């Protein structure tokens, strides 16, 4: 004799299926709400890590100066790079060289500080395709590079940092796609806050932190600076001309100051 399920049991099973669908829908809604929050949390964590990296590098740089009669490690010597090497020019197999750099003894061998954790760059060169770069930080070219922009201060010692002052002179930053050697070249010959029409510079800063970049300063502090001109984050070529770009003006204002001595 065939047995039939009771109406009550069928109703219970149908209700359980509906409950399951409701739970799935709720989970989907919660996930949709959490994913942006998790993304923002990741951005914040990367910012903090990058600021910590630039701060560690700058403190090492300051201790180096203290050990050498205030003489700072300059923009040429702080990072020995053979830019002709097809791998080194994108710093993709450079870890073995990072441990040899002059600041490394002050960093306890922690080569991770040379890279921004948000730097997504990977090599496209034959033999290295897909290999992540291992360095994204460069130094302000006005630390020791004598022939860059005539008429502007070059800093050799910490005591030279009179203008714009240690708190307003950057040492390290995240460099963008223009990265090659250890220097970040800012052209001061177009620096005039009253004339923004001819803004031009050599190297480009990175936008790795949600359209912002990490900077450290000669007083030892680090900060994340938000770019205000959308062209800054979209720049793929260099040297870089960008009329009326307030971001170039800001970087220039933190790079050097007009020398009070007459140029020869």
Regions found by a protein language model. Give the residues of each.
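N-terminal hydrophobic targeting signals that begin at the initiator methionine
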Residues: 1-2
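Short hydrophobic/aromatic-rich motifs at helix boundaries and adjacent loops
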Residues: 6, 14, 73-77
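Amphipathic alpha-helical segments typified by the pilin-like N-terminal helix
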Residues: 7, 11-52
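Short, well-structured segments within or immediately adjacent to enzyme catalytic domains
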Residues: 48-264
